[in-house]
Amino acid sequence: MDSLKIGNITLPHRAVFGPMAGFTDAPCRRLMAQHGAGFTVSEMVSSRALVYHDHKTVSLLKAEPNGAPYGVQIFGEVPQIMGEAAAAIEEYQFGFLDINMG
């Protein structure tokens, strides 16, 4: 299978494991990476909850050292809040940020 390049990340193949709220938690991402997912993405995370440091939401960001690039998906409706959430996520140094566009 051909590799896939997204920005400065090169994935070994085009098989990826996308974000699913309530499903793609840390153990699930670890399992998918072990079975060859080119990258994994967090559950969908509320930008507003991140900005307000909601404990449950922040816990969704737990990274697993599984070798596959790991990204975070955020959603929201207020551009300023989305920007603040993206800045907050930057400190975690994930491979990429995915914005859910509806």
Give each language-model segment a name.
Residues 2-5, 20-95:
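Glycine-rich, positively charged N-terminal anion/phosphate-binding segment
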